[in-house]
Every structure is written in structure tokens, then in C-alpha cells.
């Protein structure tokens, strides 16, 4: 694969702890991951970029020359989780089911989970 692997994006180390990649669409496309920002569980995303293009090799976002993640606000994270569930249900092999379940358990309020 000719792009920066999302599991190698660990900056900023003082704030971010990666738990797992939920969805990786590959080169020149997006990835979604689950982790903790300042100890709080969150869903994040980034554009992977391409190592074949020096201008885009680190993807986006980048902070201080290091590839990073964008933390999704709760309302966007919930909609993203629903879409990832649909993709998994339709057989999309790029969805990491185990990490998706960890993410749902950590981010879905109990009242929402009982109404699903």
C-alpha cells in the first residue's frame, strides 16, 4: 500500500491514544479510528493521503509536520457509527467489526443502545 497507514498516526502523544482502526478506505481516501483524547473515548477521522505525491504523503490533518486525527463531535460520531454499522451489515470488509463494537460500547449512551 502506498499511503501512510492510519495505525501509525499517533500524534500528539500527550493527548491521543489509538485503540484501533475502525475503517480504512485506503490510499487517497479516509480512515476512521477509535481511541482516547485526554482519557475520553472518541471517534476520529483523517484523510490518508498518498506516498506517491510528496505534497499529500502525510494526509490530513497535520500538526507541526506530524499526521494527526480530527476528533468528531458527538452528533457526527453517532451518525458515523450508524453508517459504519450499515456498511458492515452489507458486507464491507474494510470495517473492523471488533473495533466497531468496542467503539459503540464506549460511545453510545445506554438509553440509545436500548432503543436500537
Describe each region flagged by the PLM:
Residues 8, 21, 28, 39, ...:
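Short linear sequence elements within intrinsically disordered, low-complexity coil regions
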Residues 12-13, 20, 31, 44, ...:
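Generic intrinsically disordered, low-complexity segments enriched for polar/acidic and small residues
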Residues 28-63:
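A short, structured beta-strand/loop element
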Residues 49-116:
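Mixed-charge, Lys/Arg-enriched low-complexity segments
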Amino acid at each position: 500500500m502506498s499511503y501512510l497507514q492510519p495505525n501509525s498516526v499517533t500524534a500528539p502523544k500527550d493527548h491521543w491514544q489509538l485503540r484501533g482502526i475502525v475503517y480504512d478506505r485506503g490510499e487517497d481516501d479516509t480512515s476512521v479510528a477509535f481511541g482516547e483524547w485526554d482519557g475520553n473515548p472518541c471517534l476520529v477521522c483523517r484523510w490518508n493521503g498518498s506516498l506517491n505525491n510528496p505534497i499529500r504523503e502525510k494526509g490530513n490533518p497535520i500538526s507541526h509536520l506530524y499526521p494527526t486525527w480530527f476528533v468528531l463531535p458527538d452528533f457526527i460520531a453517532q451518525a458515523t457509527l450508524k453508517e459504519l454499522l450499515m456498511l458492515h451489515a452489507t458486507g464491507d470488509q474494510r470495517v473492523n467489526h471488533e473495533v466497531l463494537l468496542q467503539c459503540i460500547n464506549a460511545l453510545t449512551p445506554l438509553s440509545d443502545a436500548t432503543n436500537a
